[in-house]
Amino acid sequence: MGRPRRRGRDINGVLLLDKPLGLSSNDVLQKVKRLFSANRAGHTGALDPLATGMLPICLGEATKFSQFLLDSDKRYRVVARLGQRTDTSDAEGALISEREVNLTQAQIDTALESFRGESQQIPSMYSALKHQGKPLYEYARQGIEVEREARSITVYELLFIRWEGNDLELEIHCSKGTYIRTIIDDLGELLGCGAHVSYLRRLQVATYPSERMVTLEQLTAMVEAAQAEGRSPNPELDSLLLPMDSAVLNFPEVNLLPSVAAYVKQGQPVHVSGAPSEGMVRITEGKERNFIGIGTIAEDGRVAPKRLVVESVEVENLPVENKK
């Protein structure tokens, strides 16, 4: 007879993890899930093992809103190694060309300017984008080249930080779906010397503050200290979590009276005075402004629930709201 499955906690919130070097995003996710004893967990956009930095991890009901963090802007610090091009466009790949670096600051500045603003980018074959249900990197490892469509991206800011020897350090603020390694590979070809990513750190996702990041070492130390003292680590761990609606704070808020919110919790759209005329909204309830989910503005102006937080208390059946 198998060992009974251990029941996890129904803990909800967003943890800003500082992902370490060398681990995959999924490895880190599973470690955090175990440390928090969480029933459900998901990350919001993978970082390569080579990369470090901000990896928001959604626990419990917060996983329902992780897509909105996937769609948000990101900020990175990257070091490009000039003169060497690799097949993966990073330091883990095989060297495919080596060229002399004979550049001026003016040439670098001119090249960087061409990457600012809106552009079309062809994703790397060593990306997790899927083709016929399989990640592109699996085709690449088999030596198979798959045709990829160019995607619209925006580089809002591209800052020159330093240039020492063959190392060029940049800071990039970009839209969702931007591949930093592709920018560096394209930059190297534009400069005529080739380049690859030797260092990559994600500084920010959406508007989350970097000072709220915690490391796996810090989490592990909290758990071990609590266990050594015979107490639960959960209160200390839970204090690190940001609220669920932190993933959707960019949506305008619609605050409902509890009597109106009851209809929304049953999936019914409601009329709300002063609601936006279109788009997505963040729905809160009562004077405490408790977050209950997100909604959209229907064609008739009503607020229609789209994704709701599950409550432990059942909502009683209510009459259908009069549309008039």
UniProtKB/Swiss-Prot annotation:
One Pfam family matching this protein: TruB-C_2
Catalyzed chemical reaction(s): uridine(55) in tRNA = pseudouridine(55) in tRNA
Signal peptide start and end residues: none
A molecular-function term among this protein's GO annotations: pseudouridine synthase activity
Keyword tRNA processing applies: yes
UniProt xrefs under InterPro entries: PsdUridine_synth_cat_dom_sf (IPR020103), PsdUridine_synth_N (IPR002501), PUA-like_sf (IPR015947), PUA_sf (IPR036974), tRNA_psdUridine_synth_TruB (IPR014780), tRNA_sdUridine_synth_fam1_C (IPR015240), TruB_C (IPR032819)
Active site: 48
GO-annotated biological processes: mRNA pseudouridine synthesis; tRNA modification; tRNA pseudouridine synthesis
EC number(s) given by UniProt: 5.4.99.25
Enzyme class, spelled out: isomerase
tRNA processing recorded as keyword: yes
Keywords: Isomerase, tRNA processing
NCBIfam families xref list: TruB
Stored HAMAP family: TruB_bact (MF_01080)
Physiological role: Responsible for synthesis of pseudouridine from uracil-55 in the psi GC loop of transfer RNAs.
Protein family per UniProt: Belongs to the pseudouridine synthase TruB family. Type 1 subfamily.
Protein name: tRNA pseudouridine synthase B
Organism listed in the record: Yersinia pestis
Top-level taxonomy: Bacteria, Pseudomonadati, Pseudomonadota, Gammaproteobacteria, Enterobacterales
Gene: truB
